[in-house]
Regions:
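Transmembrane alpha-helical segments and their cytosolic interface motifs
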Residues: 83-110
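Cytosol/matrix-facing juxtamembrane amphipathic
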Residues: 27-30, 34-37, 41-60, 134-183
């Protein structure tokens, strides 16, 4: 394999991965906006779990398909009209990851700083306290700049599919991207 062909293949793979990642980030923002709309409509126990994929997002909820699609379209319109705050959620799993990371790193740092004088349980407690203080604001920043992207101006909600499992539905909401960004 020639070096030029190999480098071109690496570039194409990187370009493809970048597009997939960008689509997931945009769908993550729309998923958050959908949950935000559901909560604003008083469906507090409605949106339970959501996650984004390159072609849309999945929500587990007690709301029916029409309610989810309506909330998704409303949430998308909110972001498109400039309300980027709905794309950041206090309930996002990113916040849990950030809290765990801060707790672990701060516990290690405290142990290193205090050395043999330290008590492991106190280090863990201090790590937990630091995590509690900083995880929400840092989690919001990580969502804003890493795990979501609110540049969704040309995206459309394509369709929805639902499966009922007991008292819950599993909803798949499909998004469409113009200009081959999802190919």
């Amino acid at each position: 394999m020639s070096p030029a062909l190999f480098n071109n293949t690496k570039f194409l793979m990187f370009d493809r991965i970048s597009k997939i990642t960008l689509n997931v980030r945009k769908n993550h923002a729309i998923e958050h906006a959908t949950v935000s709309v559901l909560l604003a409509e008083g469906k507090k126990k409605s949106a339970v779990l959501g996650f984004a994929i390159p072609t849309g997002f999945i929500i587990s909820s007690k709301s029916n398909k029409n309610e989810i699609l309506s909330a998704a379209r409303s949430g998308l319109k909110l972001i498109q009209s400039g309300d980027e705050e709905v794309s950041i959620s206090q309930f996002c799993g990113t916040n849990i990851v950030v809290a765990a990371f801060i707790s672990g790193v701060s516990t290690l740092l405290i142990s290193r700083i205090l050395g043999k004088k330290s008590k492991n349980i106190l280090n863990m407690a201090n790590g937990f306290i630091l995590s509690s203080l900083f995880s929400k604001p840092i989690g919001r920043l990580v969502q804003k700049y890493v795990t979501t992207n609110s540049n969704v101006k040309n995206i459309k909600i394509s369709k929805g599919r639902s499966i009922k499992l007991g008292s819950f539905y599993i909803h798949y909401v499909s998004t469409s991207y113009p200009n081959l960004s999802s190919d």
